[in-house]
């Protein structure tokens, strides 16, 4: 895959992520903050971005979303077969809730 293709795919992922994040924040800010792992400050900014601003942000050559499963226990929980899918989801939510939110610091 060529470098220009990779950059285009990164931009597409960025735009899809920003559009989803903004929709989540506008529908239910508290739930969005939990699901996205962002602070109220970032959620407020996401909610107010115009379409032009979203497109400009998405044009970055850096991936804007962060892989949150950097904890071995959490990743193992999500990847191993569990007897109860509901319990697995609850356990994952508890582990994710322990992680600090992203802020503008």
Curated annotation (Swiss-Prot):
Q: Where in the cell is it found?
A: Cytoplasm
Q: Which UniProt keywords apply?
A: Activator, Bacterial flagellum biogenesis, Cytoplasm, Disulfide bond, DNA-binding, Transcription, Transcription regulation
Question: InterPro entries attached here?
Answer: Flagellar_FlhD, FlhD_sf
Entry keyword annotation includes DNA-binding: yes
Q: Which GO terms describe its molecular function?
A: DNA binding
Q: Which SUPFAM superfamilies match?
A: Flagellar transcriptional activator FlhD
Record's GO cellular component terms: cytoplasm
Gene3D superfamilies in the record: Flagellar transcriptional activator FlhD
Keyword field contains Disulfide bond: yes
Which branch of life, at top level?
Bacteria
* Example of a GO biological process term: bacterial-type flagellum assembly
Written domain comment of the UniProt record: The C-terminal region contains a putative helix-turn-helix (HTH) motif, suggesting that this region may bind DNA.
State how it assembles: Homodimer; disulfide-linked. Forms a heterohexamer composed of two FlhC and four FlhD subunits. Each FlhC binds a FlhD dimer, forming a heterotrimer, and a hexamer assembles by dimerization of two heterotrimers.
- Described purpose of this protein according to its UniProt entry: Functions in complex with FlhC as a master transcriptional regulator that regulates transcription of several flagellar and non-flagellar operons by binding to their promoter region. Activates expression of class 2 flagellar genes, including fliA, which is a flagellum-specific sigma factor that turns on the class 3 genes. Also regulates genes whose products function in a variety of physiological pathways.
Q: Which family does it belong to?
A: Belongs to the FlhD family.
- In Swiss-Prot or TrEMBL terms, this protein is called Flagellar transcriptional regulator FlhD
